[in-house]
Amino acid sequence: MKGFKSLVVMTLTLFLVFSFMGNCNSAPQRLFERRNWTPQAMLYLKGAQGRRFLSDQSRRKDLSDRPPLERRSPNSQQLTLPEAAAVLLAFLQKPQEAGDENLDQTRFLEDSLLNW
C-alpha cells in the first residue's frame, strides 16, 4: 500500500511539473524591447500587433504633431432650443419622405434575394 501511494504521488508530481513546463512557453516572456526596426518590420508589427508596438515617446510625439481640432463651421453662435428642435424635425422628416420613394426598391430586393 505504501509503495502504491508513493507511485501515485510521484506520478502526480511529474504530471504537475510537465504541465507547468508546458505553460511556461505560452506565457509572455517580457515587455517589448526597443530595437532598430526596419520600415518593413514596422509595417508587419503594426498589422500583427496594432499600435501596441509603438513606444510611449512616439505616442506622445504623434499627439503633439497633430494640428489642433477645428470647428466645422466658422459660425460660433450656438442654436437656440427652438431652432435646434426645428433642425431636428426637418432632419427626421427627410428619411421618411425618402423611405416612401424607396419602398418599391426594397420589395424588389427582398423578392430577388428570396428567389436567388
UniProtKB/Swiss-Prot annotation:
GO cellular component, one term: cytoplasm
Glutamine amide: modified positions: 49
Gene Ontology terms for molecular function: neuropeptide hormone activity; type 2 galanin receptor binding; type 3 galanin receptor binding
Signal peptide residue numbers: 1-26
Keyword Signal: yes
Origin species: Bos taurus (Bovine)
Subcellular location: Secreted; Secreted, Extracellular space; Cytoplasmic vesicle, Secretory vesicle
Protein name: Spexin
PANTHER family named among the record's database cross-references: SPEXIN (PTHR28590:SF1)
